[in-house]
């Protein structure tokens, strides 16, 4: 392991002299993690309401903007992971990303504080003139979002591995520390989501947007201060090269040698370096075209230690099998990523449903903020995970004999099924909400929308809880799947692939919203997705998404049947144990 020197750290390349401070630096890392998540989530969790109420955007426009913002943030993780692994290392990447995130939070707050940076407030009367944002206002808002995208994209793939770097993976104490750190990481993430979706959203919706957006900026500043306060104590692993280089090299060499005749597995070049720590993989029959990159010809010269003189002319069978692992995962990744196409609808249009529902709690005047309804999704996930881990897994283990009760792909498949159920429930509830709004006395008018249905907003909770449970199965299941099926040196890349799936779903959601709106606008009954949901047919849109998810489930079952799990021949013992600790991220 190569680390940067700190005041008390010693020479590079001397792993025995690295000072792992473990829990001594966790107050800095976990403290930063808590404030950073509060800052990022607090700035973006209520964004769709902010865009419709302060920037006077139409609901469908705001939903598209939020989808593009979320998609870009998630796709940015793969760029950040590449730069982190290839050039800067985790500490420098995190440092830059956190500063960018803080500046983005400040800029977002300024759009609310400074009146020229947002359009004039619209009158509440239906049909009144409502001016949208100017180009200058949009540009400033976009600049704030770009900074937040840079921050989120850099923090997500680096935070978890950086915390694990502080523990010695070769000691019992270190391995236990890594396991506990993952538990605390999940706890702080959930805690931040809950606080942001309740307290911060309440302040933004009921007190002041200026104060509500200033809170995340202040929290981000505190996170930066805490993180940099422990700077001299951290173990800082240097960049060691991106796995993307290895993937590219295998594919390029295979193309160069495409005219060679296939050979048997025993004839393939299979040099393994003495310091190699990945799981050693056996030969597989899938994608045999790539095997040609491991066929040694007379032109392929070797060094004295057996390594190739030119790595762009000859690859080892191990390198080929690692690339096969990545390629095998991609069809599964596509299906698992589409799960979030439905998930995103629950975090956008459910908010619009709640705005035209009775959000009162009991006989009092207190109303649940529309942006806080997604907290029930988080509650469903948070409550189900320990039940799954402590009750369902031991029960299933008795019948399957598997440590996890079921395979990772079976877990994802169960989540996809519940996702379909959630969308069907959403459609049925929307039918009822709209019927009540059109046939029974209403509770007034929602600004720039329409009549507020007397249906209780509590009816929206089941669809959110179902989606939360689906995420606990499909979302966490696919994260576990990527971590276990990718080679050990590609685990940062695996984490970024998970976020890229969410990003892909965000972009697809934007396209789907545009296609449905533009297509149905010409129908005699009008658009399915108008500003006033009582005049639309949102339930048809939900049924459409449920149908798409049904087709996706069929595709998932097909590729899951085709998939072959990673074939591990032997492992370096220390690395094997470290891998087990890293897998804890999924629980």
UniProtKB/Swiss-Prot annotation:
Q: In which tissues is it expressed?
A: Expressed in roots, stems and major veins of the leaves. Detected in the companion cells of the root phloem.
Which residues form each disulfide bond in the chain?
none
Show the stretches that span the lipid bilayer.
35-55, 65-85, 94-114, 135-155, 181-201, 209-229, 325-345, 368-388, 412-432, 457-477, 493-513, 540-560
- Cross-referenced SUPFAM superfamilies, in alphabetical order? MFS general substrate transporter (SSF103473)
Similarity annotation: Belongs to the major facilitator superfamily. Proton-dependent oligopeptide transporter (POT/PTR) (TC 2.A.17) family.
What Gene Ontology terms for biological process does this UniProt record contain? phloem nitrate loading; phloem transport
Q: How does it sit in the membrane?
A: Multi-pass membrane protein
The induction text for this entry reads:
Up-regulated by nitrate after long time exposure.
GO CC, alphabetical: plasma membrane
Q: Which gene encodes it?
A: NPF2.9
Q: Does the keyword Methyltransferase apply?
A: no
What this protein is called in its record is: Protein NRT1/ PTR FAMILY 2.9
Q: Which organism is it from?
A: Arabidopsis thaliana
The function of this protein is: Low-affinity nitrate transporter facilitating nitrate loading into root phloem. Not involved in dipeptides transport, but has a weak glucosinolate transport activity.
What does the UniProt entry report for the null mutant?
Answer: Decreased nitrate content in root phloem exudates. Enhanced root-to shoot nitrate transport and plant growth under high nitrate conditions.
Entry-linked Pfam families: PTR2
Q: Where in the cell is it found?
A: Cell membrane
Where does the protein principally reside? membrane
- Superkingdom of this entry's organism? Eukaryota
The protein's UniProt keywords, in alphabetical order, are:
Cell membrane, Membrane, Transmembrane, Transmembrane helix, Transport
An example molecular function term from Gene Ontology annotations? nitrate transmembrane transporter activity
């Amino acid at each position: 392991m190569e680390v940067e020197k700190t005041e008390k750290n010693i020479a590079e390349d001397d792993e025995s002299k690295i000072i792992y401070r473990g829990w001594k630096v966790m107050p800095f890392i976990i403290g930063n993690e808590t404030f950073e998540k509060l800052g990022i989530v607090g700035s973006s969790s209520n964004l769709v309401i902010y865009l419709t109420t302060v920037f006077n955007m139409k609901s469908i426009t705001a939903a598209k903007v939020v989808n593009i913002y979320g998609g870009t943030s998630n796709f940015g993780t793969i760029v950040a992971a590449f730069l982190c692994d290839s050039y800067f290392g985790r500490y420098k990447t995190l440092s830059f990303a956190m500063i960018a995130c803080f500046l983005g939070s400040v800029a977002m707050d300024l759009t609310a504080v400074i009146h020229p940076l947002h359009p004039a407030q619209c009158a509440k009367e239906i049909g009144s003139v409502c001016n949208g944002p100017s180009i200058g206002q949009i540009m400033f808002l976009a600049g704030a979002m770009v900074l937040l995208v840079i921050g989120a994209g850099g923090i997500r793939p680096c935070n978890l591995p950086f915390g694990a770097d502080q523990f010695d993976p070769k000691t019992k104490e270190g391995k236990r520390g890594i396991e506990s750190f993952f538990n605390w990481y999940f706890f702080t993430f959930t805690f931040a989501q809950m606080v942001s979706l309740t307290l911060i959203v309440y302040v933004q919706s009921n007190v002041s947007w200026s104060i509500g957006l200033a809170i995340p900026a202040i929290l981000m500043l505190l996170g930066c201060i805490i993180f940099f306060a422990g700077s001299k104590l951290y173990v800082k692993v240097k960049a060691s090269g991106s796995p993307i280089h290895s993937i590219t090299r295998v594919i390029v060499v295979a193309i160069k040698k495409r005219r060679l005749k296939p050979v048997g597995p025993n004839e393939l070049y299979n040099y393994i370096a003495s310091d190699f720590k990945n799981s050693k993989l056996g030969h597989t029959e899938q994608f045999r075209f790539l095997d040609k990159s491991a066929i040694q010809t007379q032109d392929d010269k070797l060094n004295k230690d057996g390594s190739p003189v030119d790595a762009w002319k000859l690859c080892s069978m191990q390198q080929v099998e690692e690339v096969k692992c990545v390629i095998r995962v991609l069809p599964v990744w596509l299906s698992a990523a589409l799960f979030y196409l439905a998930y995103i609808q629950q975090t956008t249009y459910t908010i619009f449903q709640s705005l035209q529902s009775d959000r009162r709690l009991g006989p009092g005047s207190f109303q649940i903020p529309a942006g806080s309804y997604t907290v029930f999704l988080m509650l469903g996930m948070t409550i189900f995970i320990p039940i799954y881990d402590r009750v369902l897994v031991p029960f299933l283990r008795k019948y399957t004999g598997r440590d996890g009760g079921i395979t990772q792909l079976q877990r994802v498949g169960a989540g996809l099924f519940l996702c379909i159920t959630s969308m069907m429930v959403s459609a049925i509830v929307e039918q009822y909400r709209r019927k009540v709004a059109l046939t029974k006395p209403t509770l007034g008018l929602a600004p720039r929308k329409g009549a507020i249905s007397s249906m209780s907003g509590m009816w929206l909770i089941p669809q959110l809880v179902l989606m939360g449970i689906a995420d606990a199965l499909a979302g966490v299941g696919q994260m576990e799947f990527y971590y276990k099926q990718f080679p050990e040196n590609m685990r940062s890349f695996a984490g970024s692939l998970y976020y890229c799936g969410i990003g892909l779903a965000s972009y697809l959601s934007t396209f789907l919203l545009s296609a449905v709106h533009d297509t149905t606008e010409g129908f005699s009954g009008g658009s399915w997705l108008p500003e006033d949901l009582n005049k639309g047919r949102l339930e048809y849109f939900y049924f459409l998404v449920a149908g798409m998810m049904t087709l996706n489930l069929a595709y998932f079952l097909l590729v899951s049947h085709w998939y072959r799990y990673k074939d591990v021949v032997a492992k370096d013992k220390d690395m094997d144990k470290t891998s087990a600790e890293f897998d804890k991220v999924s629980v």
